[in-house]
Structures are given as structure tokens and as C-alpha cells.
A protein has these predicted regions:
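N-terminal assembly/interaction segments in proteins that build large macromolecular machines
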Residues: 1-189
């Protein structure tokens, strides 16, 4: 559903959602003479496709920027620790990074223990298959885990627009006092 009616309806829902803290609150919010849930049902008849809100993402930060990828299939939000001249461009660039590189966490502290253990085990299995001595596996696996964090955590990823600096370094080059506080990525499959 990409017709003008749907796009306008989606934009109006976004304006309501920005003041909500949960999907339940959004669905029960007033929309014209009914609530959002009822409006979704009504619009299903108007647009001709079933409409539902599949997810609701919230970031509490001093500044939140966004990016909608071409084709409207990926949307990202990025929270910054402060608002300043240039925060809109910075947050959009980082949100584009999130859309393109799909990081699993902000930093290595955000990576679950299960994923870390799985990555270490995968690394050890690869090393065993290569015939590496068992005594060396732990140290080599730690190095592979560092590489995994560099590729999979947002602040450690290579910044896609220059591929020279990390996302962290890019943020600091724009504003020394700014930090990325959170990000969300939603994709239609």
C-alpha cells in the first residue's frame, strides 16, 4: 500500500505515536472521532489492504533522528545525547548506517552472553578445522571476537561514508560532547 491515502494516514499515525509510550497507548489514542484501532479497521476498507501496527519502537533521548530507506521497507531511529546545530544531519547519517549495516547492538556491552558464547564456539570450531593447536584456541578466538564486535556493534563499525573511521570517531568529529544513546531498526520482510 503505497498510495497517497495510505502515506498520509501513516504520517498522521506517526504524529500521534510520538506522544505514546506503548503500542497499546497508541491503539487507544484518539483519532478524529474514534480511536486508532478503530481507524485502522476503517482504513482497511478505504485502502483495500489489512492494516495493522506490527511493532512499536521508542527511544528516550535528548534528540532522536530517523531515516527511511528507499522503497520504505527499512526505517531506523537514532538517539543522541544532546541536540546541537548539526544533530539532524549526524543522526540521519548514523540512521543510514544502521539501515545499511544492521548492527546487533550499540556496543559490546549490549551483545548478549548467548551470542558471545556462540561466536566463541564458532571461532574455535573453525580453528580446530584448520588444525590449530588446542592451547592456542582461546587466544585466537578472543581476537576473532574483537573482530565480530567491530563488525556487529554500531559504535565500532567502520563508518560507511568514509570506511576509514569508526562510527564513534565520526560522531566525536562532529561534536565532541555527543554520544549515540540508542538505535532501533525496523524492516518489512
Amino acid at each position: 500500500a503505497k498510495n497517497e491515502s495510505f502515506i498520509e494516514f501513516a504520517k498522521s499515525l506517526c504524529k500521534i505515536a510520538i506522544n505514546c509510550s506503548s503500542i497499546e497507548e497508541l491503539l487507544s489514542s484518539e483519532y478524529e472521532s474514534m480511536n486508532v484501532s478503530e481507524k485502522l479497521i476503517e482504513q482497511t476498507g478505504v485502502i483495500g489492504e489489512k492494516l495493522e501496527i506490527g511493532s512499536f519502537e521508542l527511544i528516550n533521548s535528548e534528540y532522536v533522528g530517523f531515516y527511511i530507506h528507499a522503497g520504505n521497507k527499512i526505517g531506523t531511529l537514532v538517539g543522541l545525547s544532546n541536540k546541537f546545530e548539526g544533530s539532524e544531519e549526524l543522526s540521519k547519517n548514523i540512521a543510514m548506517q544502521v539501515a545499511a549495516m544492521n548492527p546487533i547492538a550499540l556496543n559490546q556491552d549490549g551483545v548478549s552472553k548467548d551470542i558471545i558464547e556462540k561466536e566463541i564456539e564458532i571461532a574455535k570450531e573453525q580453528l580446530r578445522a584448520e588444525g590449530k593447536p588446542e592451547a592456542m584456541l582461546d587466544n585466537i578466538a578472543k581476537g576473532k571476537l574483537k573482530k565480530f564486535f567491530k563488525e556487529s556493534t554500531l559504535i565500532n563499525q567502520a563508518y560507511i561514508k568514509d570506511n576509514k573511521s569508526s562510527v564513534y570517531d565520526y560522531v566525536k568529529s562532529v561534536n565532541q560532547d555527543c554520544e549515540i544513546t540508542d538505535f532501533k531498526r525496523v524492516a518489512l520482510v
